[in-house]
């Protein structure tokens, strides 16, 4: 089965019936399909119902059949892994921007071949998660941020005005997630300085970013 067929089977909104992220994921992940990868996803889904969610995790578990593959999920809400879920799925409760939890998670399961942020969609948490986790991506691995359209919605701490003018920050003085990743392209294309003119010094670290690709409502950062 294709990734999209598996996604439709499990009811995740990543399929072509909804966001159609599977069209982006398939060529990226197909070379890893039969390997013992470690995939970390932020966000179990299902909102506050403890027995709902996990559709994405089940999709990944079926798409990556290798017995050594691991699917790790971080979720803020209290959730229950269902009795018939694949035993290779592990669920951790915690906040995606909790450094202590992230450090513990990385120490146990890292490095990660694939990291997917499909959690809060709040710019501040999305940026912080990337700061904490990208260093734990395997060389050649990828870090995906889904639903980047949230950067343009006020209720997700976005700002149309800020995104239309990259020099203008949000009202709270911070960047939207799209502004952050747009600036990260400067790090990719202009290496050799510790701080770029348009790049906040607290984001200038020595983690080697190979590339950043922007798609409709989704971006992929690859590590060298």
Q: What positions do the PLM features span?
A:
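A short alpha-helical cap/connector motif
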Residues: 1-116, 120-145, 149-224
